């Protein structure tokens, strides 16, 4: 008898097995402090049981403005605190190492990892930190977290 992740059935059905590792779903996240203009957002996720994996790529266009404040999650998180990897790219110049943190059960925030001191610290992004965002610059992250019991 097989069990799998958060599935409640003692024996997996073909339908349940087909959802594991299948195509990811898209969602439209709400992004605070950013005006999309002609920029683009790619946001995809998969949920297997209560485990949610997501990937987001936010690219500035010529009419985009602001910076990335918080980004809404595709599914409500069971708790705050999950951390994933992120990057901010000033195209043609540098890629800054960042983290993404679940800050509420519905939001995450990308933070810059500042290595200027003895220990790395996390700093909030702003309109000028780590640089002034322009066309083709991007913020991207991947994150894994546990969904709330109701799966919304």
Segments and roles (model prediction):
Residues 2-152:
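Surface-exposed molecular-recognition determinants
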